[in-house]
């Protein structure tokens, strides 16, 4: 129960910090989604590590999914069922209403197909990095030192220099 309260506190803090991103109109939500998609597309093209705010967006989505997971484990529910079966406070003040709206908008962003596609791409990038590390470990274990040195260094070997002594003349 304490962990659940901590998650809800984190979500409300996130709601306050991202208030400028979330608004009531559909045009602003679509503009936000378009901005997210363009940033995701550029990070996909560059194949670089994702910026920190995108990783925190992934963490926020997993946090939102963890908050909803006890209700969803009972069975498959649709969005309408989840809204109807949640325990709502008796008195809805402005703060709780705005927090619920922000959480709902974050859920819509996390459940959008484009975001899920981007999340799969990020997992593929992380898997490729892990595969490269595993291949390097295999090379280190199976290949002897000389062959490994020749693989990683492209320098030609220096010929042996024989000392000339009086007996060579």
Curated annotation (Swiss-Prot):
Domain of life: Eukaryota
Chief subcellular location: secreted
Cellular component terms per the entry's GO annotation: extracellular region; transport vesicle
The keyword Signal appears for this protein: yes
One BP annotation, GO: neuropeptide signaling pathway
Presence of the UniProt keyword Signal in the record: yes
GO MF terms held by the record: neuropeptide hormone activity; neuropeptide receptor binding
Sorted UniProt keywords: Cleavage on pair of basic residues, Cytoplasmic vesicle, Secreted, Signal, Vasoactive
Residues in the signal sequence: 1-22
Subcellular location(s) per record: Secreted; Cytoplasmic vesicle, Secretory vesicle
Record site feature (Cleavage), residues: 159-161
Record's function text: Neurotensin may play an endocrine or paracrine role in the regulation of fat metabolism. It causes contraction of smooth muscle.
Family recorded in the similarity comment: Belongs to the neurotensin family.
Subunit structure: Interacts with NTSR1. Interacts with SORT1. Interacts with SORL1.
Protein name in UniProt: Neurotensin/neuromedin N
């Amino acid at each position: 129960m304490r962990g659940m309260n901590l998650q809800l506190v984190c979500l409300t803090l996130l709601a306050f910090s991202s208030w400028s991103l979330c608004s009531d109109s559909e045009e602003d939500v679509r503009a936000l989604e378009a901005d997210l998609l363009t940033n995701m597309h550029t990070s996909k093209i560059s194949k670089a590590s994702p910026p920190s705010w995108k990783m925190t967006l992934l963490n926020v989505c997993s946090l939102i999914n963890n908050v909803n997971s006890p209700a969803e484990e009972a069975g498959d529910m649709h969005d309408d069922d989840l809204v109807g079966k949640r325990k709502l406070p008796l008195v809805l003040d402005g703060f709780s209403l705005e927090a619920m709206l922000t959480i709902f908008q974050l859920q819509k962003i996390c459940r959008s197909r484009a975001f899920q596609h981007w999340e799969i791409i990020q997992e593929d990038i992380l898997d490729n990095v892990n595969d490269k590390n595993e291949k390097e470990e295999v090379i280190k274990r199976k290949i002897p030192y000389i062959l490994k040195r020749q693989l990683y260094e492209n320098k030609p070997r220096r010929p042996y220099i024989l000392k000339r002594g009086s007996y060579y003349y």
